[in-house]
Curated annotation (Swiss-Prot):
The gene is TAS2R39. Glycans are attached at residues 185, 194. The keyword Transcription does not apply. The lineage of its organism: Eukaryota, Metazoa, Chordata, Craniata, Vertebrata. This is Taste receptor type 2 member 39. CDD domains: 7tm_TAS2R39. InterPro entries: TAS2R (IPR007960). GO terms for biological process: detection of chemical stimulus involved in sensory perception of bitter taste. Belongs to the G-protein coupled receptor T2R family. Most taste cells may be activated by a limited number of bitter compounds; individual taste cells can discriminate among bitter stimuli. GO terms for molecular function: bitter taste receptor activity; G protein-coupled receptor activity. It comes from Pan troglodytes (Chimpanzee). Its main location: membrane.
Length: 338
């Protein structure tokens, strides 16, 4: 959807966009399957908003109460805020495009959604990459001088890196929209012999456009893969060393290391799937209403939800806070009945 350009005339642009969004000829899906996809997407959005909201609330409360927060907590606050905003935006976009297509097809509304979508996705990718980078620097066991110096300075660098990521994501999202706008405005119409039909050059140099749209995905993706892989290898090596010296099979330290390896592996898989789905979605390899395009949307919605549930399960503090919240919610109706 983001990669498609439209002719310069506003009314014709809106008409073409509305036709493209709801053209039944492009739809391969039955009404039942469309309803099912919408239900799955809405469930994923709600789960993601609740899970990320919980993580943000816990660390924000710690930040306010103690006037300070851990570096990992700071990253998680930034990451949770970006994901809540992204999930809310996607849910709002589906609602508006389904109920008021004419309003959604207006230039200001349409491009506002697209700029926000790109910006929040890139922010989420960058923040998750910095979280992986921070864990790698703090946990991995390497003795290189540069690595040890980075470990000493990483706490002070993270706040600057987070705000730099926001600036890079915003600049890139604006750049992507400007590229598409300039490209569309320079796609001159070709008149037919009777001057009643116009053919617009709307998909020239698709590879170049896809490159510009997806440039912001590659760097955080590579950084996340490298740091997560190196951290897994470091933990695996340390676990094997502990196993050779362990006296019992139920060593709590070894179980903690194995749990960390599994959690990071899940993070890595989710991150890669999300980045690939986002790449395909922005590149418009498939029709808007096709099953593959909807599958990309489901994966992109599942990533913030799944990636947020795992820290709640693996982090002892978050797990305890979640159990306390469940207990309060369970007791709350009983207090009203007394």
């Amino acid at each position: 959807m983001l990669g498609r350009c439209f002719p310069p005339d506003t009314k014709e642009k809106q008409q073409l966009r509305m036709t493209k969004l709801c053209d039944p000829a492009e739809s391969e899906l039955s009404p039942f399957l469309i309803t099912l996809i919408l239900a799955v997407l809405l469930a994923e959005y709600l789960i993601g908003i609740i899970a990320n909201g919980f993580i943000m609330a816990i660390h924000a409360a710690e930040w306010v109460q103690n006037k300070a927060v851990s570096t990992s907590g700071r990253i998680l606050v930034f990451l949770s805020v970006s994901r809540i905003a992204l999930q809310s935006l996607m849910m709002l976009e589906i609602t508006i495009s389904s109920t008021s297509l004419s309003f959604y097809s207006e230039d200001a509304v349409y491009y506002a959604f697209k700029i926000s979508f790109i910006f929040l996705n890139f922010c989420s990718l960058w923040f998750a990459a910095w979280l992986s980078f921070f864990y790698f620097v703090k946990i991995a066991n390497f003795s290189y001088p540069l690595f040890l110096k980075l470990r000493w300075r990483i706490t002070g660098l993270i706040p600057w890196l987070l705000w730099l990521s926001v600036f890079i994501s915003f600049s890139h999202s604006m750049f992507c929209i400007n590229i598409c706008t300039v490209y569309c405005n320079n796609s001159f119409p070709i008149h037919s012999s009777n001057s009643t039909k116009k053919t617009y050059l709307s998909e020239i140099n698709v590879v170049g456009l896809a490159f510009f749209f997806n440039l912001g995905i590659v760097t955080p993706l590579i950084m996340f893969i490298l740091t997560a892989t190196l951290l897994i290898l470091s933990l695996k090596r340390h676990t094997l060393h502990m196993g050779s010296n362990a006296t019992g099979s139920n060593d709590p330290s070894m179980e903690a290391h194995m749990g960390a390896i599994k959690a990071i592996s899940y993070f890595l898989i989710l991150y890669i799937f999300n980045a690939v789905a986002l790449f395909i979605y922005l590149s418009n390899m498939f029709d808007i209403n096709s099953l593959w395009n909807n599958l990309c949307q489901i994966i992109m919605a599942a990533y913030p939800a799944g990636h947020s549930i795992l820290p709640i399960q693996d982090n002892p503090g978050l797990r305890r806070a979640w159990k306390r919240l469940q207990l309060r919610l369970h007791l709350y109706p009983k207090e009203w009945t007394l």
